[in-house]
A protein has these predicted regions:
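Charged, low-complexity intrinsically disordered segments
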Residues: 1-133
Length: 133
């Protein structure tokens, strides 16, 4: 398969989710998506390695799953929304994962989030009372 190179691929700290990145992670994403059902989550919890094998998740992808290495999964092409299906039911919050992505503690990540909220009311007022990112 031939992939086109895009400018967005070289933005530091950004992990692009596109066809090129996600192609090799298809079995991983299929596994993560399966966590939509309680039955699948229970089966995974009973034997994570066997569950990876069931979906054909191998090599570095399997290692990331078994270690709950969310940054590794993201870098390898995992869909961030599917990863939440693995993380949240197992007691890992979105803030925990965000902290791991940035290489900081959850408390540091929470402090960064709160700091970004400083002056939000004033910024909203300047934008006409709405926020679009």
């Amino acid at each position: 398969m031939t992939w086109t190179t895009h400018d967005y691929e070289n933005i530091p700290g950004t992990y692009v989710f596109d066809g090129k990145h996600s192609y090799g992670a298809y079995p991983l994403n299929k596994l993560l998506f399966s966590f939509n059902t309680e039955e699948c989550r229970t089966e995974f919890d009973a034997d994570p390695a066997a569950y990876c094998d069931k979906f054909g998740v191998e090599g570095k992808y399997k290692e990331f799953v078994l270690k709950k290495d969310f940054l590794g999964m993201l870098r390898a092409g995992a869909n961030i929304y599917f990863m939440a299906k693995m993380a949240i039911p197992r007691g890992t919050s979105v803030q925990d994962a965000g902290a791991q992505f940035q290489g900081i503690t959850t408390k540091e990540f929470q402090a960064k989030l709160l700091a970004k909220g400083d002056g939000l009311v004033e910024r909203l007022a300047k934008r006409g009372g709405y926020w679009n990112g």
